[in-house]
Amino acid sequence: MNRGGYSWYNAPMDTQEILRALTALRASAMPGEYDLHRMVAEAFKAAGLPCAHEYRLAPHRRIDFFLGGVGVEIKKGRPNARQLLRQVERYLACDELAEIIVVTQKVTPLPARVLGKRVTNVSLDRLWGVALP
C-alpha cells in the first residue's frame, strides 16, 4: 500500500499504452494464471511501462499489476461474472486506483464503469484467437 510517496510505478500512466501492450499478447491454448502474469509483465517491460506486481491497495486487496493509477487484474478461463464484479468493486473503492483493466482468457461481461471509474475488459481469446501449440 503506497502512502502517497512517488515511485516509478505510480507516475500517471496512459491507459492506451497499457492496452497496446496487452493487446500484443498471444496466449497458448492452456496457460496457467501465473504464466499469464509472466506474459503480461514481459509485455509491460517490452513496452517500457513500469509496474508493480501483486500491488497491495489495502488490506486483503492485492491487484495483479499497478501502473500509475491503473490496475490490471488477470483471470484465467471464464471467471464467475458476479464474483469478478465484486472483486472489481473492492479494488475500485480504493482511492489510489483510478481505473481497472481486467484481462480474462474468455469473454466475461463487466459494466463499463464501476463506482464512477472506468472498467476495461481485455479477452485473450479475442486477440486474434488463441495460439495453438
Per-region residue spans from a language model:
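Non-catalytic C-terminal interaction segments of nucleic acid-processing enzymes
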Residues: 2-12, 121-133
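Amphipathic coiled-coil/heptad-repeat helices and related helical stalk/stem segments
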Residues: 58-59, 84-87
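Acidic-basic catalytic patches of nuclease active cores, encompassing PD-(D/E)XK
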Residues: 5-56
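Nucleic-acid nuclease catalytic cores
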Residues: 78-83, 92-126
